[in-house]
Amino acid sequence: MINLLVENNNSNWDKIFSFVFDIFLFIFDVIWNTKLPMTNTSIAYFLIFFMVIKLSIYAIHGTSTQYNNLGSTVNNGVSQVYSSTVRGVSDTKQGMQKHIKERKQFKINRNKKQLSSLAKQAKTREQGYRRVHK
């Protein structure tokens, strides 16, 4: 764990200050340019939201040595998930094509059933009409 209170460790304080300062500048820039009426609650939501975004950018890009381990961990995790997903999709390409064919066939069959039930309804109406008007 990083000890932020050590005097030799001023670079961490600089990073924290620049991070918070960037967030505040960005938020008030957004408020000023959009001229949105802001309450304390909405400003707090903005702060939390953009801090999460900024931290995720640090984590993904690894902009400093402090964040490199976290960034590489995030990148490895994302790449593993992506590669396994791609592998799964390429393995199941034929399965997907089969599934799409089954869905099309199901829709065709459902439409046929609906048409046949409509035809039956029309036939019974016609028979009823004939009975009444004989």
Swiss-Prot record:
Entry keyword annotation includes Metal-binding: no
GO cellular-component term (any): membrane
Localization terms from the record: Host membrane
Transmembrane spans: 16-36, 43-63
Keywords: Host membrane, Membrane, Transmembrane, Transmembrane helix
Its membrane topology: Multi-pass membrane protein
Keyword check for Membrane: yes
Similarity section: Belongs to the plectrovirus ORF5 family.
The protein's name: Uncharacterized protein ORF5
Organism: Spiroplasma virus SpV1-R8A2 B (SpV1)
Source taxonomy: Viruses, Monodnaviria, Loebvirae, Hofneiviricota, Faserviricetes
